Amino acid sequence: MTNISLDKLVTESRNENTKDIDRVETLEMLKMINDEDKKVAEAVEKELINIAKAVDKIGESFLNGGRLIYVGAGTSGRLGVLDASECPPTYGVSYDLVRGIIAGGESAMFKAREGAEDSKKLCIKDLKNVNFGENDILVGIAASGRTPYVIGGLEYANGIGATTISVTCNPESEMSKIANISIAPVVGPEAITGSTRMKAGTAQKMVLNMLSTGAMVKTGKVYGNLMVDLKATNEKLVERAKRIVMQATGSKREQVEKILKETNFDVKLSIFMIESSLDKIKAKEILDKNKGYIVEAIKEIS
């Protein structure tokens, strides 16, 4: 256990703006919470330079065969698992490319296992279980910036030469000093003292969204602002796939449905076939040559 006193942490401080939250009407209570929530986006904005550095590192790692691994305990761990689990259906990547590891294992997603966060060795074991290597990126998430489980992971990753990123909500935390890149949106005291699932959790979610989304954009998973590597695995996503191709190409539904059927609902390939007027085999060859970047593939044939 680290020796940082909790009373020195911003996230554990008492919020003077909400000290009467238990004595006001419901609407006033919610206004208090909402006023605090408004501070979150501003805190994240102040960290954009550091977030950009992290996105560039993650994108570079992806292009070189690396992965993005999140580690955290409690709410922080759950947020990592949540962000990771959304990447395959949204961007068509493997479930191994972005992974979330929570202290205490899968059961900790649904039932708190708070004691698991106190072990540095447990995180090292968890990282070894997923074959974490020097080409991978480790993002350690903890509102306090002092969680032993996460610190153990960051230290291990540093030791094998991997890039490390910390996402915390306390300035000058131990994690911030260990990680290669520190992201620390300081959201201030919580509406309910110490309840870091609130503002801190929201800030962490926003940062993780930026990290994964930014890296996917950097690696050609987005064309314009369209998710062109979407996997059409249900009726809603089938319709979304059709709309994406229509929006990207300006083509009518009938043509889009025909091309999507030909490509087995490969959205990116369908778009490039329409934009290039090439057949499936030639279009795929050029796309593959350009590592899936539609813009670069179009430049090649222009």
UniProtKB/Swiss-Prot annotation:
Residues 58-221 form the SIS domain. Its EC number is 4.2.1.126. The keyword Kinase does not apply. One of its GO terms (molecular function) is ether hydrolase activity. InterPro entries: Etherase_MurQ (IPR005488), Glucokinase_regulatory_CS (IPR005486), MURQ/GCKR (IPR040190), SIS_dom (IPR001347), SIS_dom_sf (IPR046348). It catalyses: N-acetyl-D-muramate 6-phosphate + H2O = N-acetyl-D-glucosamine 6-phosphate + (R)-lactate. Pathway: Amino-sugar metabolism; N-acetylmuramate degradation. Keywords: Carbohydrate metabolism, Lyase. Pfam families: GKRP_SIS_N. It is an enzyme of class 4 (lyase). Specifically catalyzes the cleavage of the D-lactyl ether substituent of MurNAc 6-phosphate, producing GlcNAc 6-phosphate and D-lactate. HAMAP family: MurQ. Belongs to the GCKR-like family. MurNAc-6-P etherase subfamily. Homodimer. A lyase-type mechanism (elimination/hydration) is suggested for the cleavage of the lactyl ether bond of MurNAc 6-phosphate, with the formation of an alpha,beta-unsaturated aldehyde intermediate with (E)-stereochemistry, followed by the syn addition of water to give product. This is N-acetylmuramic acid 6-phosphate etherase. It comes from Clostridium botulinum (strain Okra / Type B1).
